[in-house]
């Protein structure tokens, strides 16, 4: 049996770049492996956006500067969306991403410290449930590793 470096699952690298719009299905282990990268990219985008938001608030009456800052804001957010999509995660809102498990989503919103929630495909953020509860009750196939506490 070939050795593995822990970064591969289902025959593909966990960090494989996806084509825009390409949906990827994650196991819990795979999602947890890529989660630190998702969290770091998101934190960087949030940090990059902070001074832009401050400038927008300070220049509410100055239309040309405000318009320029709005464009910069949109560029930062779009770069973040593109990076998330290339990682195979679903962007559900600003700083809100879902990892598709095939029967639902592992759900995370910045600045939560862990990937700790789940909701079904037909549900949204408001119906998300603690991940440990879902694993305990449903024992889903995608939960192929010991839950983190």
Predicted segment positions?
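Long, non-globular targeting/processing and low-complexity regions
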Residues: 2-16, 75, 88, 108-111, ...
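N-terminal intrinsically disordered, cationic/polar leader segments
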Residues: 17-18, 23, 35, 49, ...
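Long, hydrophobic N-terminal alpha-helical segment
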Residues: 1-60
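Glycine-rich, aromatic-bearing surface loops/beta-hairpins
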Residues: 93-149
């Amino acid at each position: 049996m070939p050795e593995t470096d822990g970064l591969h699952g289902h025959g593909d690298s966990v960090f494989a770049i996806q084509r825009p719009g390409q949906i990827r299905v994650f196991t819990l282990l795979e999602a947890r492996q890529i989660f630190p990268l998702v969290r770091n990219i998101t934190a960087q985008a949030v940090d990059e956006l902070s001074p832009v938001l401050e400038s927008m608030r300070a220049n509410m009456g100055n239309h040309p500067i405000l318009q320029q800052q709005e464009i910069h804001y949109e560029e930062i957010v779009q770069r973040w969306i593109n990076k998330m999509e290339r990682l195979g995660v679903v962007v559900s809102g600003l700083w809100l991403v879902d990892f598709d498990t095939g029967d639902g989503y592992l759900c995370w919103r910045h600045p939560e410290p862990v990937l700790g929630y789940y909701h079904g495909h037909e549900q949204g953020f408001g119906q998300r449930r603690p991940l440990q509860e879902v694993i305990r009750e449903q024992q889903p196939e995608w939960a192929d590793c010991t839950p983190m506490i």
